[in-house]
């Protein structure tokens, strides 16, 4: 979590948009359920949205367009879910996608390795051509 926290804090300091999809074990998560309150979403920054592609059924795309955002940074768990789902969804909608591999996790190392390979090389060209794999300490705002 230190890598995600560092990237989160840098985004906040730069005035970048931060958006959360909260699910939780029961599908009814709220900002009070965030494991580390240092990551607590502010009003208007979150939705309760399940599924791997966080664009579906959410206000994410409207918020990105409203701010003229062209590049998204995807963090979270599970890498093979949100990383591939939202990362691919972003690329297919024309966004450049930054994948800091040290800010996504999965249930095991195989799922993490598969997701990284899929997003960087193994997925469809429309996705892989829009993805940059990196580490969180290389992301600048």
Residue ranges and their predicted role:
Residues 13, 26-141:
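Active-site-adjacent betaalpha module
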Residues 1-5:
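Short catalytic helix/loop segments, enriched in acidic residues and glycine
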Residues 8-26:
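Von Willebrand factor
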């Amino acid at each position: 979590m230190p890598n995600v926290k560092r990237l989160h804090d840098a985004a906040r300091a730069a005035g970048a948009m931060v958006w959360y999809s909260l699910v939780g074990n029961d599908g009814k998560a709220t900002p009070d359920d965030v494991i580390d309150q240092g990551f607590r979403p502010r009003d208007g920054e979150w939705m309760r949205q399940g599924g791997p592609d966080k664009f579906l059924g959410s206000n994410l795309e409207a918020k990105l367009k409203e701010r003229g955002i062209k590049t998204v940074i995807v963090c979270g768990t599970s890498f093979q879910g949100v990383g591939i789902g939202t990362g691919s969804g972003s690329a297919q909608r024309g966004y450049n996608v930054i994948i800091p591999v040290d800010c996504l996790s999965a249930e095991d190392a195989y799922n993490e390795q598969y997701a990284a390979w899929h997003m960087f090389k193994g997925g469809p060209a429309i996705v892989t051509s829009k993805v940059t794999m990196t580490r969180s300490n290389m992301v600048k705002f």
